[in-house]
Protein backbone atom coordinates (compact mmCIF):
# COMPACT_ATOMS: atom_id res chain seq x y z
CA UNK A 1 0.00 0.00 0.00
CA UNK A 2 0.99 3.61 -0.48
CA UNK A 3 2.23 5.23 2.68
CA UNK A 4 0.11 8.08 3.97
CA UNK A 5 2.90 10.56 3.20
CA UNK A 6 3.19 9.53 -0.46
CA UNK A 7 -0.62 9.43 -0.88
CA UNK A 8 -1.01 12.90 0.58
CA UNK A 9 1.81 14.21 -1.59
CA UNK A 10 0.14 12.96 -4.75
CA UNK A 11 -3.25 14.38 -3.77
CA UNK A 12 -2.28 17.75 -2.32
CA UNK A 13 1.06 18.85 -3.70
CA UNK A 14 1.51 21.07 -6.70
CA UNK A 15 2.72 19.31 -9.83
CA UNK A 16 6.18 20.82 -9.55
CA UNK A 17 6.79 19.52 -6.04
CA UNK A 18 6.16 15.94 -7.21
CA UNK A 19 9.54 15.95 -8.92
CA UNK A 20 11.97 14.40 -6.44
CA UNK A 21 15.48 13.01 -6.64
CA UNK A 22 15.69 11.74 -3.06
CA UNK A 23 13.46 8.68 -3.25
CA UNK A 24 14.44 5.90 -0.89
CA UNK A 25 14.44 2.34 -2.08
CA UNK A 26 11.87 1.53 0.58
CA UNK A 27 9.48 4.19 -0.74
CA UNK A 28 9.81 2.91 -4.28
CA UNK A 29 9.25 -0.66 -3.10
CA UNK A 30 6.03 0.36 -1.35
CA UNK A 31 4.83 2.12 -4.49
CA UNK A 32 5.67 -0.92 -6.62
CA UNK A 33 3.80 -3.24 -4.23
CA UNK A 34 0.58 -1.19 -4.30
CA UNK A 35 -2.45 -3.14 -5.64
CA UNK A 36 -2.09 -2.83 -9.39
CA UNK A 37 -5.44 -1.23 -10.11
CA UNK A 38 -4.71 1.51 -7.55
CA UNK A 39 -1.12 1.89 -8.73
CA UNK A 40 -2.15 2.47 -12.34
CA UNK A 41 -4.81 4.97 -11.26
CA UNK A 42 -2.32 6.98 -9.21
CA UNK A 43 0.30 6.84 -11.96
CA UNK A 44 -2.29 7.99 -14.51
CA UNK A 45 -3.27 10.88 -12.24
CA UNK A 46 0.32 12.08 -12.07
CA UNK A 47 0.80 11.46 -15.80
CA UNK A 48 -2.05 13.86 -16.57
CA UNK A 49 -0.45 16.60 -14.48
CA UNK A 50 2.62 16.60 -16.72
CA UNK A 51 1.57 15.14 -20.07
CA UNK A 52 -1.34 14.93 -22.48
CA UNK A 53 -2.46 11.30 -21.93
CA UNK A 54 -3.52 10.97 -25.57
CA UNK A 55 -0.11 11.92 -26.94
CA UNK A 56 2.30 9.07 -27.66
CA UNK A 57 5.54 9.67 -29.52
CA UNK A 58 6.43 7.32 -32.35
CA UNK A 59 10.16 6.57 -32.59
CA UNK A 60 12.06 4.51 -35.11
CA UNK A 61 15.27 2.66 -34.26
CA UNK A 62 17.83 1.66 -36.90
CA UNK A 63 20.91 -0.49 -36.45
CA UNK A 64 23.55 1.40 -38.44
CA UNK A 65 26.30 -1.08 -37.54
CA UNK A 66 25.18 -4.58 -36.59
CA UNK A 67 26.94 -7.42 -34.77
CA UNK A 68 30.54 -8.16 -33.91
CA UNK A 69 30.40 -6.53 -30.47
CA UNK A 70 33.12 -7.62 -28.04
CA UNK A 71 30.93 -7.18 -24.95
CA UNK A 72 29.34 -10.20 -23.22
CA UNK A 73 25.82 -8.87 -22.50
CA UNK A 74 24.10 -12.20 -21.92
CA UNK A 75 20.85 -11.20 -23.67
CA UNK A 76 22.28 -9.65 -26.83
CA UNK A 77 22.15 -11.06 -30.35
CA UNK A 78 25.00 -8.79 -31.42
CA UNK A 79 27.68 -10.12 -29.08
CA UNK A 80 30.49 -11.89 -30.95
CA UNK A 81 30.74 -14.34 -28.05
CA UNK A 82 27.49 -16.13 -28.86
CA UNK A 83 26.25 -18.09 -31.85
CA UNK A 84 23.07 -16.18 -32.67
CA UNK A 85 23.20 -16.11 -36.46
CA UNK A 86 23.71 -12.33 -36.57
CA UNK A 87 26.41 -11.37 -39.06
CA UNK A 88 28.69 -8.43 -38.36
CA UNK A 89 28.32 -5.51 -40.76
CA UNK A 90 30.15 -2.28 -41.46
CA UNK A 91 28.64 1.13 -40.79
CA UNK A 92 25.77 1.87 -43.16
CA UNK A 93 26.36 4.46 -45.85
CA UNK A 94 25.07 7.94 -45.10
CA UNK A 95 22.58 7.94 -47.98
CA UNK A 96 21.11 4.62 -46.84
CA UNK A 97 20.57 5.91 -43.31
CA UNK A 98 18.98 9.14 -44.53
CA UNK A 99 16.58 7.20 -46.74
CA UNK A 100 15.46 5.18 -43.71
CA UNK A 101 14.98 8.41 -41.75
CA UNK A 102 12.85 9.92 -44.54
CA UNK A 103 10.64 6.85 -44.59
CA UNK A 104 10.26 6.95 -40.80
CA UNK A 105 9.25 10.61 -40.87
CA UNK A 106 6.76 10.04 -43.67
CA UNK A 107 5.17 7.24 -41.62
CA UNK A 108 4.75 9.48 -38.58
CA UNK A 109 7.87 8.93 -36.48
CA UNK A 110 9.22 12.12 -34.93
CA UNK A 111 12.30 10.66 -33.25
CA UNK A 112 14.95 8.74 -35.20
CA UNK A 113 17.30 6.58 -33.15
CA UNK A 114 20.46 4.88 -34.38
CA UNK A 115 22.42 2.11 -32.71
CA UNK A 116 25.88 0.71 -33.31
CA UNK A 117 27.20 -2.54 -31.86
CA UNK A 118 30.51 -1.81 -30.20
CA UNK A 119 31.93 -1.11 -26.76
CA UNK A 120 32.98 2.50 -27.29
CA UNK A 121 34.14 5.07 -29.86
CA UNK A 122 37.86 4.79 -29.17
CA UNK A 123 39.89 4.42 -32.37
CA UNK A 124 36.87 5.08 -34.60
CA UNK A 125 37.64 8.64 -35.71
CA UNK A 126 36.56 8.28 -39.35
CA UNK A 127 33.42 6.37 -38.39
CA UNK A 128 32.61 8.98 -35.74
CA UNK A 129 32.89 11.77 -38.32
CA UNK A 130 30.43 9.92 -40.56
CA UNK A 131 28.02 9.54 -37.65
CA UNK A 132 28.27 13.26 -36.88
CA UNK A 133 27.37 13.99 -40.51
CA UNK A 134 24.38 11.63 -40.32
CA UNK A 135 23.18 13.38 -37.16
CA UNK A 136 23.36 16.80 -38.84
CA UNK A 137 21.37 15.57 -41.84
CA UNK A 138 18.65 13.84 -39.82
CA UNK A 139 18.33 16.84 -37.51
CA UNK A 140 17.79 19.04 -40.59
CA UNK A 141 14.62 17.00 -41.25
CA UNK A 142 13.15 18.48 -38.05
CA UNK A 143 13.28 15.14 -36.27
CA UNK A 144 14.64 14.39 -32.83
CA UNK A 145 17.88 12.42 -33.13
CA UNK A 146 19.11 9.85 -30.62
CA UNK A 147 22.09 7.50 -30.86
CA UNK A 148 23.49 4.67 -28.78
CA UNK A 149 27.18 4.12 -29.48
CA UNK A 150 28.49 2.58 -26.28
CA UNK A 151 30.69 4.37 -23.77
CA UNK A 152 32.02 7.82 -24.61
CA UNK A 153 34.05 10.60 -23.05
CA UNK A 154 33.05 14.20 -22.44
CA UNK A 155 34.72 15.52 -25.62
CA UNK A 156 32.90 12.99 -27.78
CA UNK A 157 29.65 13.94 -26.09
CA UNK A 158 30.29 17.62 -26.86
CA UNK A 159 30.92 16.83 -30.53
CA UNK A 160 27.63 14.94 -30.69
CA UNK A 161 25.87 17.88 -29.07
CA UNK A 162 27.43 20.32 -31.55
CA UNK A 163 26.27 18.13 -34.45
CA UNK A 164 22.68 18.56 -33.29
CA UNK A 165 22.10 15.36 -31.34
CA UNK A 166 18.96 15.51 -29.21
CA UNK A 167 19.65 12.65 -26.82
CA UNK A 168 22.01 9.77 -26.15
CA UNK A 169 20.83 6.34 -25.06
CA UNK A 170 22.88 4.47 -22.47
CA UNK A 171 20.82 1.96 -20.54
CA UNK A 172 21.59 0.72 -17.04
CA UNK A 173 19.85 -2.54 -18.04
CA UNK A 174 18.97 -3.72 -14.50
CA UNK A 175 19.71 -3.12 -10.83
CA UNK A 176 23.26 -2.65 -9.60
CA UNK A 177 22.94 -5.90 -7.61
CA UNK A 178 21.80 -8.04 -10.55
CA UNK A 179 24.00 -6.38 -13.13
CA UNK A 180 27.04 -8.66 -12.71
CA UNK A 181 24.88 -11.67 -13.57
CA UNK A 182 24.16 -10.14 -16.97
CA UNK A 183 27.36 -8.31 -18.00
CA UNK A 184 31.00 -8.63 -16.95
CA UNK A 185 32.82 -6.56 -19.60
CA UNK A 186 31.48 -3.18 -18.49
CA UNK A 187 30.74 -2.03 -14.95
CA UNK A 188 27.66 -0.27 -13.64
CA UNK A 189 29.81 2.70 -12.69
CA UNK A 190 31.20 2.92 -16.22
CA UNK A 191 27.65 3.28 -17.45
CA UNK A 192 26.95 5.99 -14.90
CA UNK A 193 30.17 7.75 -15.89
CA UNK A 194 29.04 7.90 -19.52
CA UNK A 195 25.73 9.40 -18.40
CA UNK A 196 27.67 11.98 -16.38
CA UNK A 197 29.65 12.89 -19.52
CA UNK A 198 26.39 13.36 -21.41
CA UNK A 199 25.12 15.76 -18.76
CA UNK A 200 28.36 17.75 -18.81
CA UNK A 201 27.97 18.16 -22.58
CA UNK A 202 24.37 19.35 -22.25
CA UNK A 203 22.80 16.32 -23.93
CA UNK A 204 19.47 14.81 -22.95
CA UNK A 205 19.76 11.37 -21.40
CA UNK A 206 17.84 8.29 -22.48
CA UNK A 207 18.42 5.47 -20.00
CA UNK A 208 16.31 2.53 -18.92
CA UNK A 209 16.49 -1.22 -18.81
CA UNK A 210 15.32 -4.67 -19.78
CA UNK A 211 12.69 -6.55 -17.79
CA UNK A 212 12.49 -10.32 -17.86
CA UNK A 213 16.20 -11.12 -17.59
CA UNK A 214 15.53 -13.44 -14.67
CA UNK A 215 15.63 -10.60 -12.16
CA UNK A 216 13.36 -10.34 -9.10
CA UNK A 217 10.99 -7.52 -8.27
CA UNK A 218 13.54 -5.88 -5.96
CA UNK A 219 15.83 -5.61 -8.99
CA UNK A 220 13.16 -3.73 -10.93
CA UNK A 221 12.79 -1.46 -7.94
CA UNK A 222 16.58 -1.09 -7.83
CA UNK A 223 16.71 -0.06 -11.48
CA UNK A 224 14.02 2.57 -10.96
CA UNK A 225 15.79 3.79 -7.82
CA UNK A 226 19.06 4.25 -9.74
CA UNK A 227 17.27 6.31 -12.40
CA UNK A 228 15.00 8.30 -10.07
CA UNK A 229 17.82 9.38 -7.76
CA UNK A 230 20.05 10.79 -10.49
CA UNK A 231 20.74 14.53 -9.96
CA UNK A 232 18.56 15.11 -13.02
CA UNK A 233 16.06 12.48 -14.07
CA UNK A 234 16.62 11.02 -17.54
CA UNK A 235 14.44 12.89 -20.01
CA UNK A 236 13.66 9.50 -21.50
CA UNK A 237 13.37 6.05 -19.88
CA UNK A 238 12.87 3.06 -22.21
CA UNK A 239 11.51 -0.15 -20.74
CA UNK A 240 12.18 -3.26 -22.81
CA UNK A 241 10.44 -6.60 -22.42
CA UNK A 242 13.11 -9.21 -22.99
CA UNK A 243 12.97 -10.82 -26.42
CA UNK A 244 14.81 -14.12 -25.81
CA UNK A 245 17.51 -14.67 -28.44
CA UNK A 246 18.43 -18.34 -28.99
CA UNK A 247 22.16 -18.81 -28.56
CA UNK A 248 22.52 -16.21 -25.81
CA UNK A 249 22.79 -17.35 -22.17
CA UNK A 250 19.65 -15.48 -21.12
CA UNK A 251 17.76 -16.42 -24.27
CA UNK A 252 18.45 -20.10 -23.68
CA UNK A 253 17.55 -19.89 -19.97
CA UNK A 254 14.38 -17.79 -20.16
CA UNK A 255 11.59 -19.69 -21.87
CA UNK A 256 8.66 -17.34 -21.34
CA UNK A 257 8.06 -13.64 -21.63
CA UNK A 258 7.71 -11.73 -18.37
CA UNK A 259 4.01 -11.49 -17.45
CA UNK A 260 2.48 -8.12 -18.19
CA UNK A 261 1.63 -7.16 -14.59
CA UNK A 262 5.24 -6.65 -13.33
CA UNK A 263 5.95 -4.72 -16.52
CA UNK A 264 2.96 -2.45 -15.84
CA UNK A 265 4.05 -2.05 -12.21
CA UNK A 266 7.46 -0.90 -13.40
CA UNK A 267 6.03 1.66 -15.81
CA UNK A 268 3.58 3.01 -13.24
CA UNK A 269 6.22 3.19 -10.50
CA UNK A 270 8.62 4.99 -12.83
CA UNK A 271 5.89 7.44 -13.80
CA UNK A 272 5.24 8.32 -10.16
CA UNK A 273 8.95 8.65 -9.34
CA UNK A 274 9.90 10.51 -12.54
CA UNK A 275 6.75 12.42 -13.53
CA UNK A 276 8.30 14.64 -16.23
CA UNK A 277 10.14 11.83 -18.01
CA UNK A 278 9.06 10.36 -21.34
CA UNK A 279 8.60 6.64 -20.68
CA UNK A 280 9.17 4.56 -23.79
CA UNK A 281 7.63 1.13 -24.38
CA UNK A 282 10.51 -0.34 -26.37
CA UNK A 283 11.43 -3.91 -27.34
CA UNK A 284 8.98 -6.76 -26.87
CA UNK A 285 5.87 -4.69 -27.55
CA UNK A 286 5.09 -6.92 -30.52
CA UNK A 287 4.47 -9.77 -28.05
CA UNK A 288 1.75 -7.80 -26.24
CA UNK A 289 -1.92 -7.64 -27.07
CA UNK A 290 -3.55 -4.34 -27.93
CA UNK A 291 -5.20 -4.26 -24.50
CA UNK A 292 -1.88 -4.86 -22.75
CA UNK A 293 -0.34 -1.99 -24.70
CA UNK A 294 -3.26 0.27 -23.78
CA UNK A 295 -2.75 -0.55 -20.10
CA UNK A 296 0.88 0.49 -20.47
CA UNK A 297 -0.25 3.87 -21.83
CA UNK A 298 -2.68 4.24 -18.93
CA UNK A 299 0.16 3.43 -16.52
CA UNK A 300 2.28 6.25 -17.92
CA UNK A 301 4.08 5.10 -21.06
CA UNK A 302 3.97 7.81 -23.71
CA UNK A 303 6.35 6.74 -26.45
CA UNK A 304 6.74 3.63 -28.61
CA UNK A 305 9.20 2.28 -31.13
CA UNK A 306 7.57 1.54 -34.44
CA UNK A 307 8.72 0.44 -37.86
CA UNK A 308 10.57 -2.49 -39.34
CA UNK A 309 12.88 -3.62 -36.52
CA UNK A 310 14.17 -2.94 -33.01
CA UNK A 311 17.87 -3.33 -33.91
CA UNK A 312 17.73 -7.12 -34.43
CA UNK A 313 14.32 -7.98 -32.96
CA UNK A 314 10.81 -7.49 -34.39
CA UNK A 315 8.99 -4.18 -34.02
CA UNK A 316 5.35 -3.20 -34.39
CA UNK A 317 4.61 -1.90 -37.88
CA UNK A 318 3.49 1.65 -38.59
CA UNK A 319 0.19 0.35 -39.97
CA UNK A 320 -0.50 -1.67 -36.82
CA UNK A 321 0.26 1.35 -34.65
CA UNK A 322 -1.96 3.54 -36.79
CA UNK A 323 -4.85 1.18 -36.04
CA UNK A 324 -3.88 1.01 -32.35
CA UNK A 325 -3.86 4.80 -32.09
CA UNK A 326 -7.24 5.01 -33.83
CA UNK A 327 -8.84 2.37 -31.62
CA UNK A 328 -7.72 4.05 -28.38
CA UNK A 329 -8.01 7.70 -29.40
CA UNK A 330 -4.26 8.32 -29.30
CA UNK A 331 -2.30 10.91 -31.25
CA UNK A 332 1.28 11.06 -32.37
CA UNK A 333 3.52 13.45 -30.46
CA UNK A 334 5.37 16.06 -32.47
CA UNK A 335 9.14 16.50 -32.30
CA UNK A 336 10.20 18.33 -29.12
CA UNK A 337 6.61 18.33 -27.81
CA UNK A 338 6.82 17.64 -24.10
CA UNK A 339 4.80 18.32 -20.99
CA UNK A 340 1.45 19.31 -22.48
CA UNK A 341 -1.08 18.50 -19.78
CA UNK A 342 -4.84 18.27 -20.30
CA UNK A 343 -5.57 19.17 -16.68
CA UNK A 344 -6.45 22.57 -15.35
CA UNK A 345 -4.50 24.25 -12.57
CA UNK A 346 -6.84 22.68 -10.02
CA UNK A 347 -6.32 19.18 -11.39
CA UNK A 348 -9.63 19.01 -13.25
CA UNK A 349 -9.65 17.31 -16.64
CA UNK A 350 -10.04 19.55 -19.68
CA UNK A 351 -11.51 18.19 -22.90
CA UNK A 352 -9.37 18.78 -26.01
CA UNK A 353 -10.64 20.93 -28.88
CA UNK A 354 -13.12 19.20 -31.18
CA UNK A 355 -10.64 19.00 -34.03
CA UNK A 356 -8.41 16.79 -31.87
CA UNK A 357 -11.12 14.29 -30.94
CA UNK A 358 -10.70 10.92 -32.64
CA UNK A 359 -13.58 9.57 -34.76
CA UNK A 360 -15.91 7.25 -32.89
CA UNK A 361 -14.71 3.68 -33.37
CA UNK A 362 -17.17 1.14 -34.72
CA UNK A 363 -16.54 -1.24 -31.82
Swiss-Prot record:
Superkingdom of origin: Eukaryota
Per the UniProt entry, the disulfide pairs are none
User: What keyword terms does UniProt attach to this protein?
Assistant: 2Fe-2S, 4Fe-4S, Biotin biosynthesis, Iron, Iron-sulfur, Metal-binding, Phosphoprotein, S-adenosyl-L-methionine, Transferase
Q: Name one GO biological process term.
A: biotin biosynthetic process
Q: Identify the SUPFAM superfamilies for this entry.
A: Radical SAM enzymes (SSF102114)
- Read off the InterPro entries from this record: Aldolase_TIM, BATS_dom, Biotin_synth/BioAB, Biotin_synthase, Elp3/MiaA/NifB-like_rSAM, rSAM
| EC class (word) | transferase
Name the residues that bind [4Fe-4S] cluster: 69, 73, 76
Record HAMAP family: BioB
What function does the entry list? Catalyzes the last step of biotin biosynthesis, the conversion of dethiobiotin to biotin.
Know the name of this protein? Biotin synthase
Q: Which organism is it from?
A: Schizosaccharomyces pombe (strain 972 / ATCC 24843) (Fission yeast)
Q: Which gene encodes it?
A: bio2
Amino acid sequence: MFTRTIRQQIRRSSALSLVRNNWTREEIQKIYDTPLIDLIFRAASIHRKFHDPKKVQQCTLLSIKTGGCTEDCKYCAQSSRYNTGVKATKLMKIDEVLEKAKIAKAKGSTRFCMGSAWRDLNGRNRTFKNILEIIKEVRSMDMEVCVTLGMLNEQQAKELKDAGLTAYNHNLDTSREYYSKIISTRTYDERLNTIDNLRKAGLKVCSGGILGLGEKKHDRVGLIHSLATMPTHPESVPFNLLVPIPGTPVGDAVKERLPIHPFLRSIATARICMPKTIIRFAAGRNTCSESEQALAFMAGANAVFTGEKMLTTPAVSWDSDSQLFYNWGLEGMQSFEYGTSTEGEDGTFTLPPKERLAPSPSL
